């Protein structure tokens, strides 16, 4: 997969991969907020889902925002 940041596209105001690399956000530049945030991964046993959620996909596509070549958004209309 040739998308940026291990498959996570960070679409900011300049439509490029940012330092956060948290995926395409629903609000502008929220994925680039700096601070002392902590991410917790909880693993357990649950029934298998029969569908894939967009937040779990390697290449996100929200509001027309998806990773293109060379760490850019294609098309560049992230909202």
Swiss-Prot record:
Q: What keywords are annotated for this sequence in UniProt? A: Metal-binding, Metal-thiolate cluster
Q: What is this protein called?
A: Metallothionein-like protein type 2
Q: Which InterPro entries match?
A: Metalthion_15p (IPR000347)
Function, as annotated, reads:
Metallothioneins have a high content of cysteine residues that bind various heavy metals.
Task: Tell me the superkingdom of the source.
Answer: Eukaryota
Which Pfam families does this chain map to? Answer: Metallothio_2 (PF01439)
Q: Which family does it belong to?
A: Belongs to the metallothionein superfamily. Type 15 family.
Name one molecular function that GO assigns to this entry: metal ion binding
KW Iron-sulfur (keyword) present: no
Gene of this entry: MT1
């Amino acid at each position: 997969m040739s998308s940026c940041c291990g498959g996570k596209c960070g679409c900011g105001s300049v439509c490029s991969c940012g330092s956060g690399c948290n995926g395409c956000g629903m609000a502008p530049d929220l994925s680039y907020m700096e601070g002392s945030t902590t991410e917790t991964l909880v693993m357990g046993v649950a029934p298998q889902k029969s569908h894939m959620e967009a937040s779990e996909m390697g290449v996100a596509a929200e509001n027309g925002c998806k990773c293109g070549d060379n760490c850019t958004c294609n098309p560049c209309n992230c909202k």
